[in-house]
């Protein structure tokens, strides 16, 4: 069985790890970094860039450089959180035909899973380069508070990237695996506070050790899938924009290029303020007006940043209380607090968490890598490489159906350990009703319309009977990925309907297959592009070396040959500016043929140099005709 890799598909950064024997290893990407920015850029010449190369060109291509796509995955365009992003993101978010949030990239409609798949492909390639073999299976992490649609969309992204997603696991649970696996901790209850680039989770997890087997049981989870470092960045950007407007009277929001530079500077300043008390945001030539160029130079203190984001940090505290309450525990029952996600490096976040739990969070867990390591461990559990580990996760939100009066009736309560199955018998609301609609919901509200609609289906063929008489058994079955399968059966007629919830939105099978084919076609074009670059490099090398040899040959090279070579050099130079690999190779061949006389001269010169070297050695040898003498040591007489 091949390796199952572990991928932390993050909002801001992503990370990939594998099991190396019994140890998890985080892999470095092609740029030599252990994490990869979750940024995808579509350039004017049709190239797709991922990670650091995409980030570097963002300033000149803001509309087609996509980041924080995880905030859109599995979401509806009309969602309040999506509408908030529509107004602040430099790229274009649009409503798809099915009501989902999609993106408009250079006039082409693209689904978030399709874009996230580009990041997953880079993670896959990183693992393949390290292992030296193809990788087809992965464990991918998601925020614990992701709903069914968001989990399904993440699995779709994996498929588009050419990966069979063996398991979707929750990020805090993965971090707990990374923390607890190599520690002789005995029985402990830990809180994992995960504040990443775009999402926030809190999970209360119990680690039990019985006869050498460790059980990781999630007791409760809570969170906010639209709270993270990107929101902190936005506060800083807004502050800088307002300060500049006060100072210069210019609103930078109308200038996408300036806003992209400002985004980078704001993120950098935020990071610097985790270790420094003050920083300068210095952006020369940020914009210009009739009076000339304008420069930004604004001092920002740590206290100022804290005042800007205090409410965001406080927003993360309420879910902590709910999670503890759901787990039936108090703060004193928590043995360890683990911080995950880059935003937890902010001193104010650490201080608030320490105040809430009454203890300092542990510092021995890498907030950027723990989740990917945990995913790799879960991959090892699935392949059998990691033994004596049992993971018991939970469903983050209640699941149920809409019943008479527009009420949500829960069949599976939140924080139920998964996989799980639950059935309940319902009946008809009208006399002689021959069909019922099963409307599947996810959420905690009593009114059905206030919850997330996951989908609906009809059960037909119910025998006519007075209302309340037919017995319709509805069964909810959640698999280990937290994905829901629903069936409804009329106990009288035996008629049954089943669906796997694909959400009322999401990608259908045809769309996924098309995206998989597109990804494969892109892989082919990527390979061709790589081959073109290699051929170009060979052509450049040939140009340089031939010119050098022409120079060295001097008058020894006949004029006719020199003219032919110059002509072939010029033709190759022109071909190198184009995109045709075959044309470059043909011109290289022509240059090689035109340079035959030059090669002969070069070989003669080389032979003469060799001969000259040999003569010099021989002369030296003659001079070295020295007689070895024997010496006798004469000791001084004392």
Swiss-Prot record:
SUPFAM superfamilies: Actin-like ATPase domain (SSF53067), Heat shock protein 70kD (HSP70), C-terminal subdomain (SSF100934), Heat shock protein 70kD (HSP70), peptide-binding domain (SSF100920). Induction: By stress conditions e.g. heat shock. Residues 602-620 have a biased composition (Low complexity). InterPro entries: ATPase_NBD (IPR043129), Chaperone_DnaK (IPR012725), Heat_shock_70_CS (IPR018181), HSP70_C_sf (IPR029048), HSP70_peptide-bd_sf (IPR029047), Hsp_70_fam (IPR013126). Belongs to the heat shock protein 70 family. NCBIfam families: PRK00290.1, PRK05183.1, prok_dnaK. This is Chaperone protein DnaK. It comes from Citrobacter koseri (strain ATCC BAA-895 / CDC 4225-83 / SGSC4696).
């Amino acid at each position: 069985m091949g390796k199952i890799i572990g991928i932390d598909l993050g909002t801001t950064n992503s990370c990939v790890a594998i099991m190396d024997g019994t140890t998890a290893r985080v892999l470095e990407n092609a740029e030599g970094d252990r994490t990869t920015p979750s940024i995808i850029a579509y350039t004017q010449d049709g190239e797709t860039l991922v990670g650091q190369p995409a980030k570097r060109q963002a300033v000149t291509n803001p509309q087609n450089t996509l980041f924080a796509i995880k905030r859109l995955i599995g979401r509806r365009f009309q969602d309040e959180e999506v509408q908030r992003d529509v107004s602040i993101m430099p790229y274009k978010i649009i409503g798809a035909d099915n009501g989902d949030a999609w993106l408009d990239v250079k006039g082409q409609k693209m689904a978030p899973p399709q874009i996230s798949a580009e990041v997953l492909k880079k993670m896959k390639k990183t693992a393949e380069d390290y292992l030296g073999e193809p990788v087809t299976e992965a464990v991918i992490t998601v925020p614990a508070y992701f709903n069914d649609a968001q989990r399904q969309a993440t699995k779709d992204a994996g498929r588009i990237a050419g990966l069979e997603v063996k398991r979707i696991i929750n990020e805090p649970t993965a971090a707990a695996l990374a923390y607890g696996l190599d520690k002789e901790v005995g029985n402990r209850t830990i809180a994992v506070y995960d504040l990443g680039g775009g999402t926030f989770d809190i999970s209360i997890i119990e680690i039990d050790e019985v006869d050498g087997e460790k059980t990781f049981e999630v007791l409760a989870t809570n969170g906010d899938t639209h709270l993270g470092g990107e929101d902190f960045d936005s506060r800083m950007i807004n502050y800088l924009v307002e300060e500049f407007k006060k100072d210069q009277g210019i609103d930078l929001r109308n200038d996408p290029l300036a806003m992209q530079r400002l985004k980078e500077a704001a993120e950098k300043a935020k990071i610097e303020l985790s270790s420094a008390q003050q920083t300068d945001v210095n952006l020369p030539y940020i914009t210009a007006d009739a009076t000339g160029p304008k420069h930004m130079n604004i001092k920002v203190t740590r206290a100022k940043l804290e005042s800007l984001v205090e409410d965001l940090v406080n927003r993360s505290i309420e879910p902590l209380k709910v999670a503890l309450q759901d787990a039936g525990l108090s703060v004193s029952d928590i043995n360890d607090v683990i911080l995950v996600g880059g935003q937890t490096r902010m001193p104010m976040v650490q201080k608030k968490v320490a105040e809430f739990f009454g203890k300092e969070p542990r510092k021995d867990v890498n907030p950027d890598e723990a989740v990917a390591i945990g995913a790799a461990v879960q991959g090892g559990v699935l392949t059998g490489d990691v033994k004596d580990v049992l993971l018991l996760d939970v469903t983050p939100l209640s699941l149920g159906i809409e019943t008479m009066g527009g009420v949500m009736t829960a069949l599976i309560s939140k924080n139920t350990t998964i996989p799980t199955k639950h059935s309940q018998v319902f009946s008809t609301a009208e006399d002689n009703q021959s069909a019922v609609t099963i409307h599947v919901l996810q959420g905690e509200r009593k009114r059905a319309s206030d919850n997330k609609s996951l989908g609906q289906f009809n059960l037909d063929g119910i025998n006519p009977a007075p209302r309340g008489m037919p017995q319709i058994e509805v069964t909810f079955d959640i698999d280990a990925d937290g994905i829901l399968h629903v069936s409804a059966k009329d106990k009288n007629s035996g008629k049954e309907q089943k669906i796997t919830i694909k959400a009322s939105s999401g990608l259908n099978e045809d769309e996924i297959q098309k995206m998989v084919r597109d990804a494969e076609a892109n892989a082919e074009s990527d390979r061709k592009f790589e081959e073109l670059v290699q051929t170009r490099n060979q052509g450049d090398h040939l140009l340089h070396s031939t010119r050098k040899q022409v120079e060295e040959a001097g008058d020894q090279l006949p004029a006719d040959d020199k003219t032919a070579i110059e002509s072939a050099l010029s033709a190759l130079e022109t071909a190198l500016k184009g995109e045709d690999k075959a044309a470059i190779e043909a011109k290289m061949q022509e240059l090689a043929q035109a340079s035959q006389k030059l090669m002969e001269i070069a070989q003669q010169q080389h032979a003469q140099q060799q001969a000259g070297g040999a003569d010099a050695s021989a002369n030296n040898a003659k001079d070295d005709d020295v007689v070895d003498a024997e010496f006798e040591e004469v000791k001084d007489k004392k």
